[in-house]
Amino acid sequence: MASSSAPRFRVYSKYLFLTYPECTLEPQYALDSLRTLLNKYEPLYIAAVRELHEDGSPHLHVLVQNKLRASITNPNALNLRMDTSPFSIFHPNIQAAKDCNQVRDYITKEVDSDVNTAEWGTFVAVSTPGRKDRDADMKQIIESSSSREEFLSMVCNRFPFEWSIRLKDFEYTARHLFPDPVATYTPEFPTESLICHETIESWKNEHLYSESPGRHKSIYICGPTRTGKTSWARSLGTHNYYNSLVDFTTYDVNAKYNIIDDIPFKFTPNWKCFVGAQRDFTVNPKYGKRKVIRGGIPCIILVNPDEDWLKDMTPEQSDYMYSNTVVHYMYEGETFINYSFASGEDVTASQ
């Protein structure tokens, strides 16, 4: 008994390419027999060609073009028999002819006489879009579309089959061509209303606002909540801000620095690349494709005492941290808020 998991045979096409190995039938006889077997699909053209292999055994190749699409689910449906010997059965390999022009050229390439060839009907030259045409069409879509929606609509109209099975890939391309605009951060407080410890000020001037021939150092700030850490860090310029999780799909290549805010050490991917201001590192976003991050910019890491990274690090990780960052633990009463500037206003700083 055949296994139920065996693949089901089916050929569904207007155009068929048949090969009968070791077939001694005359091409004209095979052609006439196939016209009868395929009559319900309204054949338009049939070419049957006998080919002698090096060992002298004859093979029969047949190209069939039908008006209607043939649905063949029985691999024995096109078996042929000899009139003189009904027990001699010739079984074909049945395939869809994806390119009729190529198949016709292939089966007639070495025919040495009309005796080995039989044709009936008028050959239908089926034009199939070449790779160059498809590339040109896709290039035109990319260059002329002005939004994600327009790009996807044009792809759907031009490549409906590919669109139906590769929609996720086309959506990824659309997001790459037309990314979401980077939101401009508006500081919660004027820069003049924020202050920082001299150690932090020194780091800012040396590693954030000046060029360095080597790699910049990052800064690690551990301190209580609601002391203005985040407000100060986000007021320094264009940056990538990550809170709760690191999402590389929103990475801005024009940012001057990164901020990692309230993310536990164990949940910070590529932490060495961030801390060490490394260049050209590869990331693998959970819901996106791998991408190369240009990097080379310092990072501000902000944590509260209950999630102190250094407490969770091995000695080797701690050594890397101290070698690549300025570590600052806020002292009691330290704040980034300049209360004298606030002049008695009700100031509530984040973080």
From Swiss-Prot:
Region: Transactivation, residue numbers: 246-264
Motif position, Nuclear localization signal: 286-296
Chain positions of motif RCR-2: 59-61
UniProt keyword annotations, A-Z: ATP-binding, Covalent protein-DNA linkage, DNA replication, DNA-binding, Endonuclease, Helicase, Host nucleus, Hydrolase, Metal-binding, Multifunctional enzyme, Nuclease, Nucleotide-binding, Nucleotidyltransferase, Repressor, Transferase
Domain comment as written in the entry: There are 3 rolling circle replication (RCR) motifs. RCR-2 is probably involved in metal coordination. RCR-3 is required for phosphodiester bond cleavage for initiation of RCR.
Region called Oligomerization, residue ranges: 173-185
Residues that hold a divalent metal cation according to the record: E51, H59, H61, E110
Alphabetical list of PROSITE patterns matching this protein: CRESS_DNA_REP
Entry's cofactor comment: Divalent metal cations, possibly Mg(2+) or Mn(2+).
GO biological process terms held by the UniProt record: DNA replication; rolling circle single-stranded viral DNA replication
Compartments it resides in: Host nucleus
Residues annotated as binding ATP: G223, P224, T225, R226, T227, G228, K229, T230
E.C. numbers: 2.7.7.-, 3.1.21.-
Protein purpose: Essential for the replication of viral ssDNA. The closed circular ssDNA genome is first converted to a superhelical dsDNA. Rep binds a specific region at the genome origin of replication. It introduces an endonucleolytic nick within the conserved sequence 5'-TAATATTAC-3' in the intergenic region of the genome present in all geminiviruses, thereby initiating the rolling circle replication (RCR). Following cleavage, binds covalently to the 5'-phosphate of DNA as a tyrosyl ester. The cleavage gives rise to a free 3'-OH that serves as a primer for the cellular DNA polymerase.
Pfam families: Gemini_AL1, Gemini_AL1_M
Predominant location: host cell
Active site: Y106 (for dna cleavage activity)
GO MF annotation list: ATP binding; DNA binding; endodeoxyribonuclease activity, producing 5'-phosphomonoesters; helicase activity; metal ion binding; nucleotidyltransferase activity; structural molecule activity
Disulfide pairings: none
Family (UniProt): Belongs to the geminiviridae Rep protein family.
Positions of short motif RCR-3: 106-109
Cofactor: Mg(2+); Mn(2+)
Name listed for the protein in its UniProt record: Replication-associated protein
Sequence motif: RCR-1, positions: 17-20
Annotated GO CC locations: host cell nucleus
Complex and partners: Homooligomer. Rep binds to repeated DNA motifs (iterons). Forms the O-complex, which is a Rep-DNA complex involved in the initiation of RCR. Part of the C- and V-complexes which are RepA-Rep-DNA complexes involved in the c-sense and v-sense transcription.
